[in-house]
C-alpha cells in the first residue's frame, strides 16, 4: 500500500511539473513578459507604458505577489481576465491586453498558464502605475459594449497534433497564431473602434498587414513572403 501511495504521489508530481512546463511554454508564446516588464523592472511586474489614442496605459503586475500582483486570483479569476478581459474586481480591462485572441486558449492551456504564474514566476511587490487617461475618457463601462461587439466566446478544448498528421499540424499552427501568439494584434488592420477587423485566417483581412505605432507590420498571408 505504501508503494502504491508513493507511486501515486510521483505521478501527481510529474503531472503538475508537466503542466507548469507547458504553462511556461504558453507564456513564452503569448509573450507575456514583453508587455508586463518595464525596462529595468522585475519580470512580469508591469509598469511598461503603452501610448494609446485616449492616453497612456501601463501594464499591470502579474506576478503572484498578493499585494500588487495576482497572488489572490483564483483560477476562475485568472481565466476571466485572460480570456474575457475582466479583472478580479469586475472591471473590464483595456483591449491593449489581447484577450480577444486569448479567448481561443483551451481550458488545458489556461490551467497550465495559471499553475506557471502561481508557482514558477517570482513574486514582486513593485507597485502598479496609474493610467494617464483624461477623466472623461477613463470610464470603463463602454468596454463592456466593445467586448460584446468584438470578442468571441472563450474556447474550451483544442486538438493535439501528431508529427505525421499534416492537417492536424496546420490546425495546431492556426491555434498558436490566432490564440496565444496573437499575431493579429500587430499584423491585422483595425477598425474605427481600434478592434482587429478579423480574428481568424478564414477572413481575408486577417494578418493582411497594418500600421502600428508608426511602423508597418507586413502581411503574413503568404503572398510575396518568399520574394
Range-by-range predicted roles:
Residues 1-17:
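Gram-negative bacterial Sec-dependent N-terminal signal peptides
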Residues 13-28, 147-178:
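Electrostatic cytochrome c docking/interface patches
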Residues 24-56, 84-92, 120-125, 178-213:
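Periplasmic/extracellular electron-transfer cofactor-ligation site
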Residues 27, 78-81, 116:
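Conserved hydrophobic/aromatic "anchor" residues
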Residues 37, 42-68, 96-100, 149-159, ...:
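Sequence context of c-type cytochrome heme-c attachment sites
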Residues 52-79, 100-110, 201-227:
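Electron-transfer interface patches adjacent to heme c in soluble/periplasmic c-type cytochromes
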Residues 89-105:
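A cross-kingdom feature marking solvent-exposed beta-strand/loop segments within repeated
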Residues 125-143:
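Extended, well-folded interaction surfaces typified by the phenylalanyl-tRNA synthetase beta subunit core
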Amino acid at each position: 500500500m505504501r508503494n502504491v501511495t508513493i507511486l501515486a504521489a510521483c505521478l501527481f508530481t510529474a503531472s503538475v511539473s508537466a503542466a507548469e512546463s507547458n504553462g511556461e511554454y504558453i507564456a513564452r508564446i503569448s509573450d507575456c513578459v514583453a508587455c508586463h516588464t518595464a525596462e529595468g523592472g522585475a519580470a512580469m511586474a508591469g509598469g511598461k507604458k503603452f501610448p494609446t489614442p485616449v492616453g497612456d496605459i501601463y501594464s499591470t503586475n502579474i506576478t503572484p505577489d498578493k499585494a500588487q500582483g495576482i497572488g489572490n486570483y483564483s483560477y476562475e479569476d485568472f481565466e476571466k481576465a485572460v480570456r474575457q478581459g475582466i479583472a478580479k474586481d469586475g472591471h473590464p480591462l483595456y483591449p491593449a491586453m489581447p484577450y480577444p485572441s486569448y479567448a481561443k486558449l483551451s481550458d488545458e492551456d489556461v490551467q497550465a498558464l495559471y499553475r506557471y504564474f502561481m508557482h514558477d514566476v517570482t513574486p514582486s511587490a513593485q507597485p502598479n502605475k496609474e493610467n494617464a487617461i483624461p477623466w472623461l475618457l477613463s470610464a470603463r463601462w463602454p468596454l463592456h459594449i466593445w467586448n460584446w461587439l468584438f470578442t468571441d466566446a472563450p474556447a474550451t478544448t483544442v486538438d493535439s497534433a501528431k508529427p505525421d498528421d499534416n492537417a492536424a499540424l496546420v490546425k495546431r499552427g492556426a491555434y498558436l497564431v490566432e490564440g496565444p501568439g496573437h499575431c493579429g494584434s500587430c499584423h491585422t488592420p483595425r477598425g474605427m473602434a481600434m478592434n482587429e477587423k478579423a480574428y481568424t485566417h478564414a477572413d481575408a483581412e486577417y494578418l493582411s498587414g497594418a500600421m502600428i505605432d508608426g511602423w508597418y507590420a507586413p502581411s503574413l498571408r503568404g503572398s510575396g513572403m518568399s520574394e
